């Protein structure tokens, strides 16, 4: 048993020969194998290994592991569960199985086996929920439910005064509806509230006064002021815009629109596309290894696990080398999967940490909806990453939640990295009440080779409503496409104007294709996504469902430009969350992305209009009801 175990470990280490923080560790597997080979060089029959012999071998292995720990004292071990069971698929004898389980448990508890792992490897990750986070989430939920209960109680109480209340409600309804009709917010959002008010005469009115009006506008204005402070550090070069217009005359309208919304156009960039989360994080780790000045990290979800262990250890190493690490995460995205003292623990280790929008701060405004969904990593101001990935094991397929998890990202090296840096620092400022930040120390330190790869970093959020640069960028991408339009999105909950743009493109002869997940992470959202297929399919849009699992990638490409980032095609991304992405105009980059999307479509099942029409009646009815509240979900 021990011989087979050591052999399995040795082969894993030998095959991939990875390094962890510069220390090659595959030798430990060789040492264990040599140890066991000596003990059993004359015994090839695994069944002959008795329980006493197993205990002796286990003791020797533990001794070697202890020696290895002492040799590399201070090296944080990745908490990787070793899947020894795969080495012994035919084991059926209970006594031997007990011995095997005992050995596996002992090794796992020790936490001493450190892998310089390739994230594509067969390593088991974990999803760990913390009691403190669960309690915070429950408290938040109870506060919201309490508000609902108070609304209902007040409604019941007021119904006792029917004669007086009726006239008041009628007048109030007229006032609210007139206000909504003349509001600059999205029409679908307004229609949803009108339906609620009409369906729930008293309760709906109170709900709107609590959560539907713009009483929180002062908070948004304060946040917007902090975001605008960052735009003052942007540099605009009219010559770049002129050169771009000469090369891409049909795209200059979008570029000028983005510049008018404080997103400069940059050239001299090198863009690398990563089709999976595993590829992305290996590149991120390699970039962090080279950091000498600072590392900026912003994620929506942070979950402790194998991926976090490796990131944490690497960042600790860089902090000890004198590198400044600014770590920003969204409170809602991390509440369940990080311990209560997570922020304080990181700060005690030398991290600079800020938490965006604590979930208990604005429960009266349902402010848990207004999240930072951005994902940004910047190293020394010279290279940056953004995409759909989060800092949790499922994003690199170390755990299986919804089949194969497909994500994507881009690495940008060049002048456009400053756009990612400013976007990060804007959210950093917005996450604390502090003096205005000087962005200049975070500028790049090197000049980049001249080329014609054009990029604009875009970002958006509810503070910008009703101006939505991200949504309008998508619409302009759709309207300016000449040959192809390929989109990947985990959620497809779109408004009439976006749907009209897609159907018009398809009817005009553009090859419009959309990839969505076959396996959903949210069933209600999947039903709404499926509901939105109808008019698109009828107009000639081709829709593909990713059969292996869940596609979390957020991408839109035409024949010569692309947007890769954090933006889902739904109301939440376009209106309720803070998002970011990179608009790239470069045929070479677009060809790489297109190749990946075409290969992904080969793993998909295409949905037909005839199939969509054959949905069961009860599904159709439920989808129609859900669609009324789509902007509020």
Roles of regions detected by a PLM:
Residues 491-510:
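Helical hairpin unit composed of two closely spaced alpha helices linked by a short loop
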């Amino acid at each position: 048993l021990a011989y087979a175990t050591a052999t399995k470990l040795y082969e894993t280490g030998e095959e991939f020969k990875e390094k962890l923080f510069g220390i090659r560790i595959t030798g430990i597997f060789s040492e264990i194998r040599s140890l066991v080979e000596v003990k059993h060089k004359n015994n090839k029959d695994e069944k002959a290994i008795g329980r006493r012999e197993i205990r002796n071998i286990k003791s020797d292995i533990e001794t070697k592991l202890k020696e290895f720990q002492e040799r590399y004292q201070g090296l944080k071990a990745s908490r990787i569960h070793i899947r020894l069971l795969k080495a012994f698929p035919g084991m059926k004898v209970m006594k031997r199985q007990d011995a095997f389980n005992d050995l596996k448990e002992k090794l796992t508890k020790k936490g001493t086996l450190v892998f310089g792992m390739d994230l594509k490897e067969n390593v088991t990750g974990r999803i760990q929920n913390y009691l403190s986070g669960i309690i915070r989430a429950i408290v938040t939920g109870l506060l919201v439910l309490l508000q609902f209960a108070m609304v209902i109680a007040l409604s019941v109480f007021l119904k006792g005064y029917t004669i007086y209340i009726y006239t008041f409600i009628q007048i109030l309804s007229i006032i609210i509806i007139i206000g909504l009709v003349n509001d600059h917010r999205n029409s679908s959002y307004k229609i949803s509230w009108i339906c609620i008010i009409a369906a729930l005469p008293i309760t709906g009115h109170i709900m709107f006064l609590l959560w539907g009006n713009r009483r929180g506008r002062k908070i948004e204005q304060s946040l917007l002021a902090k975001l605008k402070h960052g735009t003052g550090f942007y540099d605009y070069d009219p010559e770049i815009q002129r050169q771009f217009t000469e090369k891409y005359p049909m795209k200059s309208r979008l570029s000028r629109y983005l510049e008018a919304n404080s997103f400069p156009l940059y050239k001299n960039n090198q863009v690398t596309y990563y089709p999976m989360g595993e590829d992305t994080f290996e590149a991120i780790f390699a970039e962090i290894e080279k950091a000498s000045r600072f590392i900026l990290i912003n994620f929506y979800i942070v979950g402790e696990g194998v991926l976090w262990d490796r990131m944490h250890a690497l960042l600790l190493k860089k902090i000890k080398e004198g590198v400044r690490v600014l770590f920003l995460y969204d409170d809602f995205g991390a509440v369940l999967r990080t311990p209560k003292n997570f922020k304080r623990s990181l700060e005690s280790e030398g991290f600079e940490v800020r938490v965006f929008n604590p979930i208990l701060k604005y429960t009266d405004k349902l402010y848990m909806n207004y999240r930072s969904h951005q994902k940004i990593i910047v190293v020394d101001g010279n290279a940056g990453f953004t995409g759909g990935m989060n800092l949790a094991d499922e994003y690199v397929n170390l755990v299986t939640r919804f089949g194969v998890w497909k994500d994507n990202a881009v690495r940008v090296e060049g002048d456009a990295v400053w756009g990612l840096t400013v976007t990060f620092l804007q959210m950093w400022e917005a996450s604390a009440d502090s003096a205005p930040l000087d962005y200049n120390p975070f500028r790049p330190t090197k000049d980049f080779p001249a080329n014609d790869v054009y990029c604009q970093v875009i970002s958006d959020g509810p503070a910008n409503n009703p101006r939505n640069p991200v949504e309008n960028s998508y619409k302009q991408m759709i309207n300016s496409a000449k040959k192809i339009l390929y989109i990947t999105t985990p959620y497809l909950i779109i408004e009439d104007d976006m749907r009209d743009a897609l159907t018009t493109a398809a009817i005009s002869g553009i090859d419009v294709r959309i990839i969505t997940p076959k396996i959903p992470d949210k069933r209600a959202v999947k039903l709404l996504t499926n509901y939105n297929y109808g008019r698109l399919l009828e107009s000639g849009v081709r829709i593909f469902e990713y059969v292996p699992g869940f596609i979390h990638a957020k991408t839109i490409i035409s024949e010569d430009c692309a947007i890769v980032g954090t933006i889902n095609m739904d109301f939440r991304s376009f209106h309720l969350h803070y998002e970011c992405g990179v608009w790239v105009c470069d045929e070479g980059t677009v060809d790489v992305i297109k190749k990946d999307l075409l290969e992904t479509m080969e793993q998909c099942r295409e949905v037909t209009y005839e199939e969509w029409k054959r949905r069961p009646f009860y599904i159709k009815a439920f989808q129609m009801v859900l669609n009324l509240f789509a902007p509020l979900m």
